[in-house]
């Protein structure tokens, strides 16, 4: 299965990637591609993202920009291939402490966030605020590949639109690629360059480029 165009070397390539509950998977992403995956709960969607992010051990091979996963140290890979889980994780008392360089006012406003939110205790932030800040934290690493696990599932329509716009702008500016798990068919129609379904660990292509 592929989302390639005319590029000689795909940005991301999977060959025979498998794990418990995940059948051998082949996938290729070209720069600026946005691959959407849907499917029932427990079908292997999140597992695939975790495998690509090198968070779970697996069999098979993965290449990034023509370089094999084995050529990277773990932290190097996870900076270049970044995952945003459904429920963002935080380990400092406030969001600001998670950034080497704080996001600018425009970046915050683009996601409908105020500067003050960076210094508020994490426990006082809404789910939507945490998720939007987690996206900014991920983008601060300038990843080549974004792995997004239902990033807008708990957001309202306005925040969803802002997240979509920010991801789309980042992809266009940087040439990055995205694997986006979503159950929102309309969202996939708006953004996807290719669509897949996951069922019982098997990934199947179902749709082409968004209009």
Where are the model-predicted features located?
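Helix-to-loop junction immediately C-terminal to a conserved catalytic motif
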Residues: 52-53
């Amino acid at each position: 299965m592929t989302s390639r165009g005319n590029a000689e070397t795909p940005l991301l390539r999977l060959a025979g990637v498998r794990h418990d509950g995940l059948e051998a998977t082949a996938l290729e992403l070209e720069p600026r591609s946005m691959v959407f995956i849907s499917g029932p709960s427990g079908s292997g969607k999140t597992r695939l993202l975790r495998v690509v992010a090198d968070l779970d051990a697996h069999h098979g091979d993965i290449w990034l920009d023509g370089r094999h996963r084995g050529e990277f140290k773990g932290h190097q890979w996870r900076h270049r291939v970044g995952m945003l889980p459904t429920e963002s994780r935080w380990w400092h008392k406030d969001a600001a402490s998670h950034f080497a360089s704080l996001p600018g006012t425009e970046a915050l406003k683009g996601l409908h966030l105020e500067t003050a939110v960076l210094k508020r205790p994490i426990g006082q932030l809404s789910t939507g605020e945490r998720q939007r800040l987690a996206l900014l934290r991920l983008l601060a690493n300038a990843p080549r590949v974004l792995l997004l696990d239902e990033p807008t599932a708990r957001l309202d329509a306005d925040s969803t639109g802002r997240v979509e716009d920010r991801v789309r702008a980042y992809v266009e500016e940087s040439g990055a690629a995205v694997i986006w798990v979503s159950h929102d068919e309309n969202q996939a129609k708006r953004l996807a360059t290719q669509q897949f379904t996951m069922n019982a660990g098997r990934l199947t292509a179902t749709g082409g480029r968004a209009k």
